[in-house]
Design a protein with these regions (language model features):
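Conserved "HGTGT" condensation-loop signature of ketosynthase/thiolase-family condensing enzymes
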Residues: 1-83, 99-107, 111-243, 247-249, ...
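General structural concept
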Residues: 82-90
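A glycine-rich, Thr/Ser-enriched phosphate-binding loop motif common to dinucleotide/cofactor-binding enzymes
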Residues: 89-92, 293, 355-359
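Conserved phosphate-binding catalytic cores of ATP/NTP-utilizing and phosphoryl-transfer enzymes
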Residues: 91-100
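A conserved active-site cap/scaffold subdomain adjacent to cofactor or substrate pockets
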Residues: 350-357, 368, 373, 377
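Active-site-proximal alpha-helical segments within enzyme catalytic domains
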Residues: 361-364
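Gly/Pro-rich active-site capping loops and adjacent beta-alpha segments
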Residues: 386
Length: 490
């Protein structure tokens, strides 16, 4: 007998739009509505009403209340229309939040969705076309804001123009490379092999955007179609946001699922979750080679489910760049030889901005139903490896459990940041990247450095020759000079 308040995922669907005809291209609202309709059909029941329909914030629509627009198109009468802030952790956070409220008797049916039409929007802008869905609908009532909106960039990072993911995530990988004692070429071969494994999973995934497996050499070698973006990453190692994709999930209480007549073979149980964040700003993180919040949050989610990482047969680690997979594998204690994705990751399965992990969860639900494993684990990440949400899914029911290790994380050491005259002088390179232009040439070097007192400072340089030198050899540990205006002098 399943406890009537047990949360259960009863429906999941994914939508891809590949049309090259802009007249046929549908916007994110239409794609999300198709995903919702598909998730309801996947449940094998008629679901015309829900307590809430919540949308993961999309970068492809400026509609005031996208959830209300999706509900109207999908024919779902929802009591509440929700909208998350930005953050790739949002899909798993939404599942954790809905599961907790279902278990507490506050909710019986939640529809979650997210989607992007970034590819069609980009192509329309390039063609000078103004598609109907590109005009924002401001007529709806304001949505209900859900989740934590977090400022991700320290003012000093903004002032130094260090704000893009491709300017920050590569620095984690450079620090990992130095810590492992690998040369530049050996390290690039290593991460290219990791990404080749992701591409092979995507090639088997019918819902992946790119289903072409790539060799490590194809991924590692810069070229006209695979330029260097942010050293050490070629284009193939970056999340692919140039996609039109949507996904949706339907969660119910067990008693609502029974009342709706949803077959038991559709049920997959979210059994535990955890949500937390690192120190808010990268400037204050103690190290570029560890994610303490992932160490604590993942272990907590697994402990609450009574499982270890080795017990979970299906895993999807967030994968916007190779660094985050390596950091996550080490933090969670996953055997590096294991498959760390069920989709193929953001570079190959597709990176629809904040909503990637909803595709991972939808894929996980399908694989658990098929009997591939009785348990699955999802880690969703937002910001610069900042916000984390973890979920454990099971073929068998269990009481929902959730907790957060945030108090313990907040008590951990943070690194002081110095700027201006306090940063000027000799310093040791801690991590760095070289941002390349569209022509593939070095354009801007960015370094996190440590002062003799152990504080962190930022330094940049736009000399192409210095950028080429930093991309050719190991600079972590070298002594450089920093100027008051954030200049980096070799």
């Amino acid at each position: 007998m399943v406890d009537p308040r047990t949360p259960v995922v009863v429906g999941a669907a994914q939508v891809l739009q590949r049309t090259d005809d802009l007249a046929e291209a549908r916007g994110p609202i239409a794609l999300m509505a198709r995903a919702v309709t598909g998730a309801v059909a996947d449940a094998g029941a008629t679901i015309a009403t829900a307590d809430e329909l919540t949308v993961v914030r999309s970068l492809s629509t400026r509609d005031r209340n996208p959830a209300q627009a999706v509900a109207r198109r999908a024919g779902i009468a929802a009591v509440r229309h929700g909208l998350t802030p930005h953050g790739g952790n949002s899909p798993q956070w939404l599942v954790n939040d809905a599961a907790a409220r279902i278990a507490a008797g506050q909710l019986d049916c939640a529809v979650l969705t997210g989607g992007e039409a970034a590819r069609s929007r980009r192509r329309a802008k390039a063609a000078g076309a103004d598609l109907p869905w590109m005009t924002a609908d401001e007529s709806s009532a304001a949505p209900t804001a859900v989740g934590e909106a977090l400022d991700l960039s320290h003012p000093a990072e903004v002032a130094a123009r260090i704000v893009l993911p491709i300017e920050i995530y590569p620095m984690f990988d450079v620090a990992l490379r130095a810590g492992a004692g690998l040369g530049v070429a050996a390290h690039r071969a290593q991460i290219a092999e990791l990404w080749s494994r992701f591409s092979r999973v995507a090639a088997r995934n019918p819902s992946a955007w790119s289903r072409t497996a790539m060799t490590p050499e194809q991924i590692a070698e810069p070229g006209p179609d695979n330029r260097m973006v942010g050293f050490p990453y070629t284009k193939s190692m970056n999340a692919n946001n140039d996609v039109d994709m949507a996904a949706a999930l339907v969660l119910c209480s067990a008693e609502r699922a029974e009342a709706l007549g949803i077959p038991r073979d559709r049920w997959v149980f979210p059994v535990s979750g955890a949500d937390c964040r690192e120190h808010q700003y990268v400037s204050h993180r103690w190290s570029f080679t560890r994610l303490p919040a992932v160490e604590l949050g993942a272990r907590l989610a697994l402990d609450l489910a009574g499982l270890s990482a080795a017990d979970v047969g299906l895993v999807d680690l967030y994968s916007c760049f190779p660094s985050v997979v390596q950091l996550g594998t080490a933090a969670i204690g996953i055997d590096p030889s294991r498959e760390p994705t069920v989709t193929g990751g953001l570079s190959f399965a597709g990176g629809p901005f904040n909503n990637y992990s909803m595709h991972a969860i939808a894929t996980m639900v399908g694989l658990i139903r098929e009997g591939r494993s009785p348990h699955g684990f999802v880690w969703a990440n937002g910001g610069y490896a900042t916000k984390h949400s973890f979920g454990v899914y099971s073929a068998s029911p269990a009481p929902w459990r959730h907790a957060s290790p945030q108090a313990e994380i907040d008590a951990m050491p943070s690194r002081a940041l110095v700027t201006g005259s306090d940063a000027a002088g000799a310093a040791s390179v801690e991590a760095y990247t070289v941002v390349h232009g569209r022509d593939g040439a070095p354009a801007r070097s960015i370094a996190a450095v440590r002062t003799p007192a152990g504080a962190r400072a930022w330094a940049t340089n736009e000399d192409p020759a210095l950028g080429a030198a930093m991309a050719a050899d190991e600079w972590v540990g070298r002594t450089v000079r920093v100027t008051e205006d954030v200049g980096l002098l070799a």
